[in-house]
Amino acid sequence: MNTRLLSIAGCSWAVAGLMAALLTPSVTAADPPPLERVQTIALKGPVGGLDHLAVDARRGRLFVANTVNNTLDIVDLKAGKLLKQVPGQGGIRGIDYSAEVDRVFVGNGTGGVCNTFDGDTYELIKSVPLGDDADNVRYNPGARRIYVVHADTELSVIDARDYTLRSPIALPKGLGAFKLEAGRPRMYANAKEGHVMVIDTDKDEVIGRFPVAPAGVNAAVAVDEPNHRLFIGCRKNPALVVMDSDTGKIVASVPIPGDVDDLSFDARRGRIYASCGEGAIAVIRQIDPDRYESLATIPTTGRARTSIFNAEAGQLYLAVPRSADRPDQVNPEVWVYQARP
């Protein structure tokens, strides 16, 4: 692998942008790809969008928000096939799975509800109405709370013990993806006007606001907790922005394709995977906490922009909507990529 460094630590943004544009990696034919597509799994549904995914690693199950079909799709990863579709999930968008409580949490945009399902039987346990446009969902096992993006400006908080609503967390318009730390009571929420909101999950209060400029429309987030690094995927001036999770200081920026929607951090291999609706997965290597380089750009297909990484299997799952532009594609799909080496 003959790659050239894209770190911008200690450089001005202008110089960094020029360097990032000029110094692109070159991959020889002998190099194995960092991600190899190994399987295609067919779902069912019409032309239209898919949204977020979640993984039950113990059972080998993948959950897919089949938005256009209004179903929660459950994939058997071992068999490589669609296992079940749970109907009645109007405009399903966000999904999270918690092994600690063996529950699947779903945010439905139409009708704005958060549904909780049994992780074994997939029976509905509780439906909590929030109002229109429920979206991303995360479960906090320490506090036993469910967080749901709602109405584009609010983070609804549900007590998972009795499913009562707590006081919501008001945030700037354009609220998108968010991520919780496992080791301390911190949450990082993307406000797409150009800030990452830092939230204390013990108090459910905003305690910080980190700008991502000159990038913007920050849509995706991942965390490297041991090294105190935030990875922010931005659609304006498309880039992976790396910042100190304690101070908000930007330490690096690497160009990526447009329309990013999901990021995953592969801690074992020191990589970040960015799935982009422009038709590619960007693979970025972490040299050290302050230095990063573009390792590869894996071609995919247009509008396939949501994904999740299964660390136990070393696999990335990409949601590929059924498209009118691909008449040979008769179903929405999940593309399975194996991380190499």
Protein language model annotation of sequence segments:
Residues M1-N2, A14, L18-M19, D31:
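Terminal low-complexity, poorly structured segments
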Residues M1-A9:
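N-terminal secretory signal peptides that target proteins for export/translocation
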